[in-house]
């Protein structure tokens, strides 16, 4: 994939969408094959509350690109890219270790509906609760899988995480 993290990263980022809002299928981008594959159907009767993907040309310590949940009122097709603004982080661990995710909203030019949201603290409590509930429960029926949420991070923490993930990828 030739797409980078975004010309204005970490303030605005490219997010490659793997999983559309409302899907109960976990898709994953296979970098080697350059295709999106079905990883699995969620075992729980849940759907992704928002569009989910990653920032291209980033690398987390677990060897994967930095994950992003993009808030919105519409479902995006897998394989599309949306320019988004990070507004914070959700810190979590799963059976494989730390698995934090950036929380983002579409950039104002793409969708001005979120122009007043600059930090996860600005989100209605109901939306924060929906995100936590999804990630706490979406793996519950899968053998030997679990998730533990440890809290929220600010927009500054998200931008720092993005910078580090970009640098880690550049260093190889």
Swiss-Prot record:
Coiled coil: none annotated. Mg(2+) 1 binds at residues 62, 67, 99. Its cofactor is Mg(2+). The keyword Hydrolase applies. Keywords: Cytoplasm, Hydrolase, Magnesium, Metal-binding. The keyword Translocase does not apply. GO terms for molecular function: inorganic diphosphate phosphatase activity; magnesium ion binding. It catalyses: diphosphate + H2O = 2 phosphate + H(+). Mg(2+) 2 binds at residue 67. It is found in: Cytoplasm. CDD domains: pyrophosphatase. Belongs to the PPase family. Catalyzes the hydrolysis of inorganic pyrophosphate (PPi) forming two phosphate ions. HAMAP family: Inorganic_PPase. Homohexamer. This is Inorganic pyrophosphatase.
């Amino acid at each position: 994939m030739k797409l980078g993290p975004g010309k204005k990263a970490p303030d605005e980022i490219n997010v490659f969408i793997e999983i559309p809002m409302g899907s109960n299928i976990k898709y994953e981008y296979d970098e080697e094959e350059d295709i999106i594959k079905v990883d699995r159907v969620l075992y729980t009767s849940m759907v992704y509350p928002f569009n989910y993907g990653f920032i291209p040309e980033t690398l987390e310590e677990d060897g994967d690109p930095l994950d992003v949940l993009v808030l919105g009122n519409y479902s995006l097709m897998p394989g599309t890219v949306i320019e988004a603004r990070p507004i914070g982080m959700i810190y979590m661990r799963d059976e494989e270790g730390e698995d934090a995710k950036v929380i983002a909203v579409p950039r104002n030019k793409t969708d001005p509906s979120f122009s007043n949201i600059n930090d996860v603290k600005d989100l209605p409590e109901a939306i924060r609760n929906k995100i936590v509930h999804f990630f706490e429960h979406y793996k519950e029926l899968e053998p030997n899988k679990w998730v533990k949420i440890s809290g929220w991070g600010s927009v500054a923490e998200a931008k720092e995480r993005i910078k580090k993930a970009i640098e880690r990828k550049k260093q190889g």
